[in-house]
Structure formats: C-alpha cells, structure tokens
Amino acid sequence: MRINPTTSGSTVSTLEEKNLGRIAQIIGPVLDVVFPPGKMPNIYNALVVKGRDTVGQQINVTCEVQQLLGNNRVRAVAMSATDGLTRGMEVIDTGAALSVPVGGATLGRIFNVLGEPVDNLGPVDTRTTSPIHRSAPAFIQLDTKLSIFETGIKVVDLLAPYRRGGKIGLFGGAGVGKTVLIMELINNIAKAHGGVSVFGGVGERTREGNDLYMEMKESGVINEKNIAESKVALVYGQMNEPPGARMRVGLTALTMAEYFRDVNEQDVLLFIDNIFRFVQAGSEVSALLGRMPSAVGYQPTLSTEMGSLQERITSTKEGSITSIQAVYVPADDLTDPAPATTFAHLDATTVLSRGLSAKGIYPAVDPLDSTSTMLQPRIVGEEHYETAQRVKQTLQRYKELQDIIAILGLDELSEEDRLTVARARKIERFLSQPFFVAEVFTGSPGKYVGLAETIRGFQLILSGELDGLPEQAFYLVGNIDEATAKAMNLEGEKK
C-alpha cells in the first residue's frame, strides 16, 4: 500500500526531491504541462498544482496524467475546477497514481474523488491507502458459486432475480425511479445484509446524495454516536463537479470496496448511481484530449473504459462484491452506445418503463424487458421458474391483445382471452409494491415480501382462485393476503 500524496501534506513538502514542471496550456479541465527532458511522469501519475491565483487565493488542484505528447509535454485532466490557474504555474509530479484511504476508517464518512473527507467530521486515518488504478483479479482467483440475492421486491425476486456476487443494472430514462429503487435496495439489503456497503454517487444530484446520507443516519446504517460501527462508506462526485472527478469517482468507490473484499475477506455491496455519468464524463474530456469521437459523439475508448471498471467488480475466493448500478438511458433509447455497452457486463437487468410509471405502477419495472441469467430451473427451482414463465406468458398475451382491445373493445375478445386480460391486469397491479423509502409520497407503509410469499401470491392469481376480486385490491400491497383483505374492505365500502 502506498501513502496517498493527495491527503498527506508532508509527502509534497520536500520539493527538491520532486519532479517539477510548468503549465503550458489550459483548455477547460485539461492541462498541458512541460517537464524537464528525461523527467516525464508516467500515465495515471497524480500531478499537484499549488500556488496562489491573481486575487491571492490559495490553489491546490490535483490532476491525472492521460497522455504523453512528445516535446517533454504531458496532457492531464484536473480533478477539481481549474479556475485561477495560469500558464507558467509550477506543477509537482507526485510519482504515483491517485491513492485513497481504505479499510474501516472509511465507514460512516463521505469522500470526494481524492479520498478527502467532505463531511466536516475531521481527518480520516490515511495510514492504509490504495491506488485507484489496479488490474482486475486473475482468472484463477474468481469464484463461480451461484446463489440468489433476495431483495424483498416482488417483481425483481420473481422475474429477474439478482445473483449474490453479481452485477445488476437498473435501466431507465429520466424520472422513472432508478434512484428510489436503489435507495429501497440499500434499505432492504444493507440492513438485512449486515456486511459493509460502498455507495458511489457518480454525477447525480447533490440533493439526492444529501437525502441518502440523512436517511442512512436515521436508519442506523451510519451510526452517528460511534462512526466506526457504521456499515457504509459514501463517495460523491456530483453533477457540479468537473468531468475529471466524475470520471474517476467510480474507481475511488470501487477501490474502497476491493479492500473490504481482498484484505478483510468480506462480502461487499457496491452501489453506483449513475454509471452513465462515468461514460458521459469520459466523453466530455475525450475531445479535449484530441481523440476522434465515435458513434453518437462518445469516446472511441468507451468499451475499454467500461471494461476496466466492470472487470474489477467481481467475486473472488476471498470475498465478493455484489454491484447494483443505475444506468440512465438517454431519450429512453436502450440501443444508445452507453447503455448497450453496459448490458454486456451484467448478470441481471432491471428495466424501468415510462409507460408503467405513467400508469402509477411503482416500482415501474418492465416485467417483459427485465432479464436475469439466474432465472433457470437448476438455480431457482422448478416451482419458481414455472411461475415466472406463466406470469410472463400471461403478460405477453395481454400485450398482444392490447391493439385489438383499443380498436374493438373487450367485448369482442373470446372468453379465454377476457380471462387472460383480467388476470394480467391483476398481475400488473400486484407487481407494484409500497416502498419504505417512498412512504412520504405514497402514504402507505413499506413492505418487504419474501420469495416464497411472492411465488404463492402469483400462483393463486394464475390458478384463478382470485378471479372474483376487483383488480384495484392488488394495487400497492405487500403479499397476497393483504390483497384479499383490501378486497374485503372495498366490498365493505360499497355497502
């Protein structure tokens, strides 16, 4: 483990030993720095610019070397705003990649991309640090055990179950509920899981980051009285940060998670909200670094950058990282290069649909578009697999009949099709569920539904035992018993 040059002031104090350069050019977040002949820094080395701006304000900007240009020049991307920097300013090559604090000292704290605490709770113990650039675990170190990760969310557990130690993507356009779903998963899993979690806020709203922090304090995931007993480390690089920070903050969070997996041999949860912003930040600096844009203006290195991050998120024989990533889908187009590249790395995809969200069905998970490699009879068992397939078939038939219903109406359908439509509408509503984190909006207390209860509920609907109940009885309830109780209440109100 190296000492982190960006958080330990003493490491940069002896300038004589340091390799010094000067700023030659500043283009937004990208700097060109000239070094003496034969003293070029390596790719990914951290450079520090210290000094004062024209008004006398202290400047301390950390950059990361991206390209060696020739003529003793390097091109670097700044991790914070470049306001106040001028040509000719002195730049110090730290001689190492960016390193961040890791281990128990990170729990209960909020960090920026450089691993500096931003929660005003004092300094963090930086004796154990780790560089943010590492290679993925070797092939022989990987673990291949298959087991289900129960979330307590009906639609997920039944139709697209998550793999323990796998990678899960939540896909959706703007405002369909990705962050709320991630917060519910943190609430359900991080509390029940008992292990440690790392949350990487990549280019999302600062307000949401603050809400999450407050919620974690309320729920006890972050223990205010004894920070060391907290279960989560938070790393934020929000929308207002320069692209350099948004491009690297995911790696900072991942580095902290890797330490818990490799050294502490724990099972870790890694939440990333939002992985699309990682790609977006890369495309923002790509043109400034002189690369030719690829499809839809993305960086030509898109799949390489995504691969180098995703391949590190894996389960080894020491421990596992289960990663849940929100993926923003630009203009609801799943064929856009950013979500399309992400798809290739995932074990399960939970696709959020604007159509369901418009109907008021939350979580707005599309039961036909969402997929999982775990939905196989040998993994989940025959009963679960059969129920999931029958639910999908019923919903698919309903989808096919919708055009006929729109033109001719329900009365023109055969008796069998009318029954299918009635059951599909009940299933659609029963797939909705009140969330703990959304109690404020829905007014209904949150519900956690175990997998066995979920399967039983859908089997009862499919068998026809509940054909006599009104479909609104199935909307925003937990298990099937709540739906029957709600139906009785509705009957009572009618009388």
From Swiss-Prot:
PROSITE patterns: ATPASE_ALPHA_BETA (PS00152). One of its GO terms (molecular function) is ATP hydrolysis activity. Its EC number is 7.1.2.2. Signal peptide: none annotated. ATP binds at residues 172-179. It is found in: Plastid, Chloroplast thylakoid membrane. It catalyses: ATP + H2O + 4 H(+)(in) = ADP + phosphate + 5 H(+)(out). It holds the Pfam family ATP-synt_ab_N. InterPro entries: AAA+_ATPase, ATP-synt_VA_C, ATP_synth_F1_bsu, ATPase_a/bsu_AS, ATPase_alpha/beta_chains, ATPase_F1/V1/A1_a/bsu_N, ATPase_F1/V1/A1_a/bsu_N_sf, ATPase_F1/V1/A1_a/bsu_nucl-bd. It is an enzyme of class 7 (translocase). GO terms for cellular component: chloroplast thylakoid membrane; mitochondrion; proton-transporting ATP synthase complex. Keywords: ATP synthesis, ATP-binding, CF(1), Chloroplast, Hydrogen ion transport, Ion transport, Membrane, Nucleotide-binding, Plastid, Thylakoid, Translocase, Transport. It is a peripheral membrane protein. One of its GO terms (biological process) is proton motive force-driven mitochondrial ATP synthesis. SUPFAM superfamilies: C-terminal domain of alpha and beta subunits of F1 ATP synthase (SSF47917), N-terminal domain of alpha and beta subunits of F1 ATP synthase (SSF50615), P-loop containing nucleoside triphosphate hydrolases (SSF52540). F-type ATPases have 2 components, CF(1) - the catalytic core - and CF(0) - the membrane proton channel. CF(1) has five subunits: alpha(3), beta(3), gamma(1), delta(1), epsilon(1). CF(0) has four main subunits: a(1), b(1), b'(1) and c(9-12). Produces ATP from ADP in the presence of a proton gradient across the membrane. The catalytic sites are hosted primarily by the beta subunits. Belongs to the ATPase alpha/beta chains family. This is ATP synthase subunit beta, chloroplastic. It comes from Hyacinthus orientalis.
